[in-house]
Amino acid sequence: MQEPLLGAEGPDYDTFPEKPPPSPGDRARVGTLQNKRVFLATFAAVLGNFSFGYALVYTSPVIPALERSLDPDLHLTKSQASWFGSVFTLGAAAGGLSAMILNDLLGRKLSIMFSAVPSAAGYALMAGAHGLWMLLLGRTLTGFAGGLTAACIPVYVSEIAPPGVRGALGATPQLMAVFGSLSLYALGLLLPWRWLAVAGEAPVLIMILLLSFMPNSPRFLLSRGRDEEALRALAWLRGTDVDVHWEFEQIQDNVRRQSSRVSWAEARAPHVCRPITVALLMRLLQQLTGITPILVYLQSIFDSTAVLLPPKDDAAIVGAVRLLSVLIAALTMDLAGRKVLLFVSAAIMFAANLTLGLYIHFGPRPLSPNSTAGLESESWGDLAQPLAAPAGYLTLVPLLATMLFIMGYAVGWGPITWLLMSEVLPLRARGVASGLCVLASWLTAFVLTKSFLPVVSTFGLQVPFFFFAAICLVSLVFTGCCVPETKGRSLEQIESFFRTGRRSFLR
């Protein structure tokens, strides 16, 4: 009797049968790692994630600046600031919805390239904004582009990457998003808010230029009957000195079995609905850990706590820690496995959120030298209560706890949820299902980001962090019960697993 996917004894979380002896295709796959073209194609695509990460945290230095603006057309009230921070996620949800159509209609590569249009237009609107409506529209357009790339880029990368490095390459979308956020934090120390928007145009233009010379996904080309073009694309990605026919036949056989789009009736079949459910719940839990409101209001959160360093510097430090952590995840994902990193990630985030919530509840009020804004006050420039004196190095707790949270998120639930989404979704439903996951993810992010400031004003800043800590505990249980280990398996092997008659891991 075969063992179930989860619950097997042993520390390695192996969820697949033992591998057969290396085939010619497995041996040839090693040679593909020496071909740099697949890395170039990945880099060209994930520049879209750089722009996404840059746009996501654009409000962190801009909201405090506009709060202090003397221009009545650009001065933000507390309510307007919450809309400016959260409307990005509404645009991202719309982008995820459009990806359900564009991913399979235009293909992965052209969909990524199409995202450059709303992204460039959004940055231009914010750079030349003369009123709130231009800021909101620009933010929505950059959000739309971010939602579209969030659904398309992981699929494209997973479909062009060899199994041996798919974990590392699958982490690059998150890595580039983090690098984009760090770039925004660093430039925010040097540039005024309008020039920050101008600088956001650069990665968009470079992405368009590089992707023009990259091939489309061989799996997408095969699904459209363009076999010769698919073979040329695979040979280009793997290198001319590698025999790609074994891998091509495996992909072709899988595509042939799924020559039509999945119907709603078929979507209820276990081998289709289970991986979609896992991917969807992972995306929801990822957002419910609090990552989006924390990043969007990062500088304002530091403004509202007793921090020893200037909030702008704190935000930049957190961005650097996030980048380093994602880099570590990218290097270890194919060694440690997905599940181990997810467990570690959720445990670290739980400890960080709980620590930050307890500090805010019992700790000192914000320090006057560094506090230019207060999340709990009606106006971020005026605090409702007198400020306490510094409490020494205790005031480093918000920075250290936030760094710990970002580190935990970046080594697991940040990059791995995107990677697993692209790995477990069946090919026939991959385009639509990835768009559905992104749509649900960003609708959740909008609700959290829009409600964050009202909840803080009504109940206190500690309440959201206690909620986020509870969600991290749920994530630990979900990882143990429902998430499969996909390390070292091809997309065809993963999909074949869900088609077997074994006991379901969804109990």
Curated annotation (Swiss-Prot):
Topological domains, Cytoplasmic: 1-37, 103-111, 162-168, 216-289, 336-339, 417-435, 484-507
Phosphoserine sites (modified residues): S23
Ranges facing Extracellular side: 59-81, 133-140, 190-194, 311-314, 361-395, 457-462
GO cellular component, as recorded: lysosomal membrane; membrane; plasma membrane
Keyword Repeat applies: no
Gene Ontology terms describing biological process: D-glucose transmembrane transport; dehydroascorbic acid transport; fructose transmembrane transport; hexose transmembrane transport; regulation of glycolytic process; transmembrane transport
Binding site for a D-hexose: Q174, Q286, Q287, W418
Tissue-wise expression: Highly expressed in brain, spleen and peripheral blood leukocytes.
Motif residue range(s): Dileucine internalization motif: 5-6
Chain ranges passing through the membrane: 38-58, 82-102, 112-132, 141-161, 169-189, 195-215, 290-310, 315-335, 340-360, 396-416, 436-456, 463-483
Membrane topology: Multi-pass membrane protein
Entry GO MF terms: D-glucose transmembrane transporter activity; dehydroascorbic acid transmembrane transporter activity; fructose transmembrane transporter activity; transmembrane transporter activity
InterPro entries, alphabetized: MFS_dom, MFS_sugar_transport-like, MFS_trans_sf, MFS_Trehalose_Transporter, Sugar/inositol_transpt, Sugar_transporter_CS
Cross-referenced Pfam families: Sugar_tr
Chain segments carrying region Disordered: 1-28
Glycosylation site list: N370
UniProt keywords, alphabetically: Glycoprotein, Lysosome, Membrane, Phosphoprotein, Sugar transport, Transmembrane, Transmembrane helix, Transport
Signals that turn on the gene: By lipopolysaccharide (LPS).
Localization annotation: Lysosome membrane
Family from the record: Belongs to the major facilitator superfamily. Sugar transporter (TC 2.A.1.1) family. Glucose transporter subfamily.
Matches recorded under PANTHER family: PTHR48021, SOLUTE CARRIER FAMILY 2, FACILITATED GLUCOSE TRANSPORTER MEMBER 6
Function: Probable sugar transporter that acts as a regulator of glycolysis in macrophages. Does not transport glucose.
NCBIfam families named in the record: SP
Stated name of the protein: Solute carrier family 2, facilitated glucose transporter member 6
